[in-house]
Amino acid sequence: MVLIRVLANLLILQLSYAQKASELVIGGDECNINEHRSLVVLFNSSGFLCAGTLINQEWVLTAANCDRKNIRIKLGMHSKNVTNEDEQTRVPKRSTFVSVAKTSHQTLGTRTSMLIRLKRPVNDSPHIAPLSLPSSPPSVGSVCRVMGWGTISPTKVSYPDVPHCANINLLDYEVCREAHGGLPATSRTLCAGILEGGKDSCQGDSGGPLICNGQFQGILSWGVHPCGQPHKPGVYTKVSDYSEWIQSIIAGNTDVTCPP
C-alpha cells in the first residue's frame, strides 16, 4: 500500500511538471548558455526592445523596426535575474539601414535591417563571440535555429527570463507568398517555420538571428499574430544578399550602394 502511494505521488509530480513545462514554452526550450554568444539585447529606458546579432567586435546587425531613441546594447546575457561576470553594455556610435523597394504588404516598409556600430569594441569573453556573415545562401529544407527573449505565449505577452531556442525549417519563398498576401514575386527575404504550426519566433524576437547549418542566414523581420499558426511561417531578411554591402560599410566605404 505504501509503495502504491509513493508511485501515485511520483506520477502526480511528473504530470504536474509536464503541464508546467508545456505552459512555459511555445515550441522551444531554454537555449544552452553557450549557443547564443552572438545574441544581443537591445533596450532603452522603456525596457526590452529587440534582439540582434554581433557580427564582429564593433558591429551588430538587427531589424530596422528596432530603431529607437537612446538604445543600449547588452551582450553576454543569459538570465535577466542572474548576471554573468562577462556581461557588457554598449551604446551605438552610428546606425546604417538596409533599404528595399516598398511592397504592397502593409507590414513592410522601405527599411528592413539596421547595422549598428558600437561606440566601443566588445571585449572577448566566454559568453560573447561574433557570428560571421554567411559565405553562401541557405538551401530550402535546411533545419534552422531561431532564438531570442521574445514572448513564449502565442496570444499574450509573456517574456521569459532566459532566451529560448527552437528548430524550424527553411521553406520555399512561394510558401510565404501564399501565406501572406501582397508579397512580390521575388524578394531578398527567407521563409521559415513549421507548416504544422507550434514552433515560431514571436513578439520581442524581432531582429534576432536565423542560423542554418551554423551560419547566420536571416534576421527576423515579421510574422503573423498569434504566433505559431499552421501554414503561417515567418519572414526573415536574407543576410547573404547583403553580405558584400555590409562588409563594405564596415570597411569604411559609406558611399556603397545597397542592393536593390
Swiss-Prot record:
Which Gene Ontology BP terms does the record give? killing of cells of another organism; proteolysis
Keywords of this entry: Blood coagulation cascade activating toxin, Cytolysis, Disulfide bond, Glycoprotein, Hemolysis, Hemostasis impairing toxin, Hydrolase, Myotoxin, Protease, Secreted, Serine protease, Signal, Toxin, Zymogen
As a miscellaneous remark, the entry gives: Negative results: does not present azocaseinolytic activity. Does not provoke vascular lesions or hemorrhage.
PROSITE patterns, alphabetically? TRYPSIN_DOM, TRYPSIN_SER
- Regulation of its activity: Inhibited by benzamidine and partially inhibited by EDTA.
Q: What is the protein name stated in its UniProt record?
A: Thrombin-like enzyme bhalternin
Q: What does this protein do?
A: Thrombin-like snake venom serine protease that induces blood clotting in vitro, defibrinogenation in vivo (by intraperitoneal injection into mice), albuminolytic and fibrinogenolytic activities. Preferentially cleaves the alpha chain of fibrinogen (FGA). Causes hemolysis in the heart, causes apparent hyperemia and lymphocytic interstitial pneumonitis in the lung, causes necrosis and inflammatory infiltrate in the liver, and causes glomerular congestion in the kidney. Also provokes a drastic myonecrosis.
| Description of how the protein assembles with itself and partners | Monomer.
* Lineage of the species this protein comes from: Eukaryota, Metazoa, Chordata, Craniata, Vertebrata
Q: Which InterPro entries match?
A: Peptidase_S1_PA (IPR009003), Peptidase_S1_PA_chymotrypsin (IPR043504), Peptidase_S1A (IPR001314), Trypsin_dom (IPR001254), TRYPSIN_SER (IPR033116)
Q: How does activity depend on temperature?
A: Optimum temperature is 30-40 degrees Celsius.
Regarding tissue, the record states:
Expressed by the venom gland.
What GO molecular function terms would the record report? serine-type endopeptidase activity; toxin activity
Supply one GO CC term from the record. Answer: extracellular region
According to its UniProt entry, this protein's organism is Bothrops alternatus (Urutu)
Proregion residues excised on maturation = 19-24
